């Protein structure tokens, strides 16, 4: 019985160990590949729990999501013979799930060592060998990332389709201390030169601004002067027009006044000519004698009413003719007294 119990215990232990080794788990973002007797099996498995033959079959988990491979301390010799070192080069890549079996079969599960690490060393040394330290360290440093990515992807497309390079990041290389100090001094002098150039640009810009400001101010003054001059010219022209209008109005008034006076004189002359008839003159004579308070006696008193009437009427007819032609007339009383 004791031996039977021992056999059962050993069998149970063996069964538990077999079951434990047969059950395995594949994480999300990974693909499981299987080996049996050292040979790669064609079957693969996705994320989850799976069973395999214990002690005979083994598995490896291959990541298919984005991963970053770091290549450290890569030596590089420039065309001038200076040895420099890149501390760290990061390669971001991912593996297409359908290409896992072919890549693992050709390059093992550690495919990144053969396809990425060794390729980085090779491409970087190729780049440094055809460029000077100045080009690698300063002038072409910003192109190293893109050049490495393109070179890697071009080779992987033909050697391992399904392995995609997402990005490559290269740190600044380490150069000899003496050369580094020289570059620092050079950068310092370059910075000073840039600062001086910027200051000069600022001064030139300020001078240009002042010049434009003065030009604008001068243009403003000129425009104000032009506007003022135009206003004065318009005022003078307005005054001239007003004066011409006033002169024309005065001339028209004077002309109208002269025409009215001439017309009045002509009408008066015509009225006097019509009025100075012999009968009217005889009547005026009688009125004058009647209003005279002094009467002289003599032999000629009767004749003054008879004879002098004809001569006086003739004189007044001549006077009326003179008035009709616009000549100066003598007062009626003066003509009467002279007679």
From Swiss-Prot:
GO biological process per UniProt: cholesterol metabolic process; ERAD pathway; negative regulation of cholesterol biosynthetic process; negative regulation of fatty acid biosynthetic process; regulation of cholesterol biosynthetic process; SREBP signaling pathway
Its membrane topology: Single-pass type II membrane protein
Family (UniProt): Belongs to the band 7/mec-2 family.
Protein name: Erlin-2
Record PTM text: Deubiquitinated by USP25; leading to stabilization.
Matching Gene3D superfamilies: Band 7 domain
N6-acetyllysine, modified sites: 267
Glycosylation-annotated residues: 106
Molecular function GO labels: cholesterol binding; ubiquitin protein ligase binding
Subcellular location: Endoplasmic reticulum membrane
Domain of life: Eukaryota
Record topology, Lumenal segments: 25-339
Record lineage: Eukaryota, Metazoa, Chordata, Craniata, Vertebrata
Cytoplasmic side: 1-3
Transmembrane parts of this sequence: 4-24
Organism this protein belongs to: Homo sapiens (Human)
